[in-house]
Amino acid sequence: RMYQLKLDANDPLKGVLKIAADGDVSASGANTKGTDIINPDNICVTQNYVYIQEDGDSFWPEATHNSLIWQYNIATGSKKVFMDMTHGDANMLNSIYNPAGANQLKKGIWEHGAMEDISDVIGVPGTFTINVHAHTWIDGDKFLNPSKATSVQSYKSGGQTLIITNVPR
């Protein structure tokens, strides 16, 4: 779920908290688990939209789609898919990016994260970066604990940083 907190303009100690995006039930009350928004993780807020990035690597067993970025319209409260994490080439996907194991066919195993508006930095309106967490892109030990951070267990997964343009703000 993603919540929206609207503060009272006259008294910031008062406000209304509501569910803005719910992946468990639709507005009509129907069960939508795995078909709508899954495990919202990161958000990027612009003047008119909230971009909600799913954390699909939670291996949601009911997932029916790969990780998505949803565009939530602040004015209307509606949301739609903005970007899909479709991997493309099935042969490459299963030989390089998902070399073995039970997770290779699961939906949402890669995710988007860290969406940032860089328009003001580079002087090009509507330009954003997005990080792709490619959790099954293993490639031997090439990506073994790349940050060298102390971790409960070592990990290895590749990633990419994308620059996208013409993003509505």
Where are these regions (language model features)?
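Sequence/structural signature of beta-propeller domains
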Residues: R1-R169
